[in-house]
Structures are given as structure tokens and as C-alpha cells.
């Protein structure tokens, strides 16, 4: 019933004024993960509907609806995902061995926006994709999103905002972004400029917003938010030299009542003559602790909630891809936490079984001490099928 009302509310206005395009995909995934000597089987079925209408003079409408239903193990013990040194001093004296949480089915409006076209630029209003930066696995400039290391390019949830894009000249433009909060002080404000120079693009960004970070009271076990006034200034460069793609991205963040910090990323990619593709990145997050023994439970909660880009400071990410045929490719995703010396190897296979159907297989093997970020997990596997329509 809820879906019918939501779908009708999106579809009827577009049908009144003209033709609407409806497309999307169905995705089914099964996963297994072994962590802290416990195995979890789980998965989901997901339907994504995309609505697009560009038949209005000077305007375009777009929306996405996601319906996702989980199966298998939908109730988890959160303490399995923390090293014993992190949770035992807090929970064991109270006789607590489990901190359960459940994964709930979802039905939500991922994006819904109108884009207005003017002679001097475009204005986009509504819940929209705002993804900043040039990095593949991390983006120091992006204060709206965090990425999954096993799937950095997976779609991100839209941001409620107001965006003005003004082209200044060829290969140069300025963006103004506002994401409303409870008042002006708690709203996110950003200005981004982009300039193309020969084989390179230069990006400059400034912004300010209220940074919410989870804080668990260890006496009452009630969650609350720590609000930090954050101002960010940064930039990025992306281009190509001798067939090698190179990029860099950085941001300096000033915080009221907290220590300022820097985030940096550098990367490159290259495709060999035989079709082998390689990408590598190094990332530094000055806001995260440098050593494992400086972590506490709140650091883990903030990372799991997507409130920080990384758990510790220094990371590498490497991906290899090779086409075996027009329909089958193999690859490897490797990432490492240089701060605690843990890492993961994730071989994968992608099969385009039919014209609009792909099936992927992934296996993950994790290395490091049991109290490290990736060493805590033993192995995982994933099978994903996606069919477009």
C-alpha cells in the first residue's frame, strides 16, 4: 500500500505533462561472512525503479525508488564486529555478551528532483546525487558520502539540496550547493569551481556544515550526537600523462572545539595493451587515530555509521581487471590498513550472462592480527545477479 501511494505520487505528475521513461533493475545477492569465529548467511532482493521525464521545455524531472527485502540472518550481534579489547571492558562487567541489531526491509525515495535550465546555468532542486571529488575508493572533498571498499562505485543515496551550476567558459564552471538543515547554521554550504587546462582538470572547493558524530554514553548506553562546526577548504587535480591517468585530492578541515586535520589522496590507473587494467590509491585521514590502541568503541560506531571516511589513518587500495572474453572478466580488489598492518584480498569474476543480465562472484580473504580492522574478519563470499529493464 505504501509503495502504491509513493509510486503514484511520482508517476502521475509526469504522465499529466507528457511521456515518462520508466527503467531500472532487479538485483539479488547472497553473502556469507565469517567474523569473530561466527558465520552469517544473509542476502537481499532489490527492485530499483527510475523515472525520467525531459519533455518539459527548460526543465527535467527524475526520481528513483528502491525496494529492498532481506533474508537469511537478519539479526546480528554487533559485538562480533569489534575487537575484544574494545568492547569487553565496557560490557563484560555487566554480564553483556551480545548487543543485537536487526536489518530492516526498506522502501525509500532515493532521488526526486527537478532540474531547471536557464541561459546562464542550471538549477537542481530536491533529493539529488551530489558526489564530489576525483578519488575512486575515498574522497576527501565529499562531505555527503562514504564508499564501501568492496564496491566503491555502488550507487549512493541522494542528498536533499539546492544546486546551481554556472558555466563560466569552455571547461570552466562554478557550483553552489546548499543542503538545508534545521537553520542556516546547521545547513551545509559549498562552493566548487572547476577549470580545465590542457590534459588536466583543476578543482577548488570550500564549504561549511555541522558535523554530527555518534557518541555512546558508556554509563547509560544511550546514543547521542556530538555536533562539530566544520569548515573545509580543498582541491583536486585529475589528468593523464603518457597514457597513465593520475589524480590527487586533498582537504584541510577546521573544527570548532576540536583539532584541525587534513585528508589526502593520490592515485593512478593504466590499461596495458593486452587489456589488463590497474588502479592504485593511497589515502591519509588525519582525523582518525594513528594506532589501534588509541581507538575506542565510538570510533567504530562513527565509522560504521558513515560519519568518517576511515577507521585509522593510512590506507592503500589496488584493483586489477582483465577481460577473458567479451562476456567474462576477472579481477582482484586489494586494500590494506597500513596503520594496523591488516589487509584483504578479494578475487572476483564478472559474467555478462545475457544482454541485460550480469552475474558476479567475489571471495574475500582477510589478513592481520585478530584485533585489527581487517584481521577481525576471516573470509567472505558474495554472489550477485542484476537484471536491467
Question: Across the structure, where does each feature detected by a protein language model lie?
Answer:
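Residues that define the transmembrane beta-barrel architecture of outer-membrane proteins
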Residues: 41-45, 105-110, 156-160, 185-189, ...
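Detector for outer-membrane/organellar transmembrane beta-barrel domains
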Residues: 235-335
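Outer-membrane beta-barrel "beta-signal"
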Residues: 318, 322, 351, 357-358, ...
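Outer-membrane beta-barrel architecture
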Residues: 48-50, 112-115, 163-165, 192-194, ...
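Repeated loop/turn-to-beta-strand initiation elements of outer-membrane beta-barrel proteins
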Residues: 20, 57-61, 120-123, 171-174, ...
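Outer membrane beta-barrel
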Residues: 57-172, 194-195, 368
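Transmembrane beta-barrel strands of outer-membrane/channel proteins
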Residues: 24-30, 63-69, 125-127, 176-180, ...
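Surface-exposed strand-loop-strand hairpins of Gram-negative outer-membrane beta-barrel proteins
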Residues: 30-45
Amino acid at each position: 500500500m505504501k509503495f502504491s501511494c509513493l509510486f503514484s505520487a511520482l508517476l502521475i505528475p509526469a504522465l499529466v505533462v507528457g511521456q515518462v521513461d520508466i527503467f531500472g533493475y532487479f538485483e539479488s545477492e547472497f553473502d556469507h561472512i565469517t567474523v569473530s569465529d561466527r558465520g552469517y548467511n544473509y542476502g537481499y532482493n532489490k527492485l530499483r525503479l527510475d523515472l525520467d521525464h525531459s519533455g518539459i521545455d527548460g526543465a527535467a524531472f527524475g526520481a528513483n525508488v528502491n525496494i529492498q527485502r532481506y533474508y537469511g540472518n537478519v539479526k546480528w550481534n554487533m559485538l562480533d564486529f569489534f575487537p575484544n579489547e574494545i568492547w569487553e571492558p565496557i560490557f563484560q562487567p555487566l554480564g553483556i555478551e551480545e548487543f543485537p541489531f536487526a536489518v530492516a526491509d526498506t522502501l525509500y525515495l532515493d532521488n526526486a528532483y527537478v532540474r531547471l535550465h536557464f541561459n546562464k546555468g542550471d538549477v537542481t532542486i530536491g533529493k539529488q546525487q551530489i558526489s564530489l571529488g576525483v578519488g575512486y575508493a575515498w574522497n576527501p572533498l565529499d562531505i555527503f558520502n562514504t564508499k564501501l571498499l568492496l564496491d566503491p562505485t555502488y550507487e549512493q543515496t541522494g542528498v536533499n539540496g539546492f544546486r546551481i551550476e554556472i558555466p563560466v567558459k569552455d571547461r570552466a564552471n562554478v557550483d553552489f550547493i546548499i543542503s538545508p538543515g534545521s537553520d542556516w547554521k546547521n545547513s551545509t554550504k559549498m562552493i566548487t569551481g572547476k577549470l580545465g587546462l590542457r590534459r588536466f582538470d583543476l578543482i577548488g572547493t570550500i564549504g561549511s556544515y555541522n558535523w554530527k558524530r555518534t557518541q555512546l554514553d558508556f554509563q547509560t548506553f544511550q546514543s547521542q550526537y556530538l555536533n562539530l562546526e566544520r569548515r573545509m577548504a580543498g582541491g583536486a587535480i585529475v589528468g593523464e600523462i603518457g597514457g597513465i591517468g593520475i589524480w590527487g585530492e586533498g582537504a584541510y578541515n577546521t573544527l570548532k572545539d576540536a583539532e584541525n586535520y587534513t585528508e589526502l589522496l593520490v592515485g593512478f590507473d593504466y590499461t596495458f595493451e593486452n587489456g589488463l587494467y590497474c588502479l592504485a590509491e593511497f589515502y591519509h585521514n588525519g582525523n582518525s587515530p594513528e594506532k589501534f590502541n588509541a581507538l575506542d568503541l565510538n570510533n567504530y560506531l562513527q565509522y560504521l555509521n558513515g560519519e568518517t571516511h576511515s577507521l585509522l589513518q593510512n590506507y592503500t587500495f589496488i584493483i586489477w581487471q582483465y577481460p577473458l572474453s567479451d562476456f567474462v572478466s576477472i579481477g582482484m580488489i586489494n586494500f590494506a590498513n597500513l596503520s594496523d598492518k591488516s589487509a584483504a584480498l578479494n578475487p572476483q569474476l564478472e559474467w555478462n550472462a545475457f544482454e541485460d543480465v550480469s552475474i558476479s562472484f567475489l571471495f574475500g580473504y582477510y589478513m592481520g592480527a585478530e584485533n585489527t580492522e581487517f584481521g577481525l574478519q576471516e573470509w567472505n563470499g558474495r554472489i550477485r545477479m542484476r537484471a536491467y529493464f
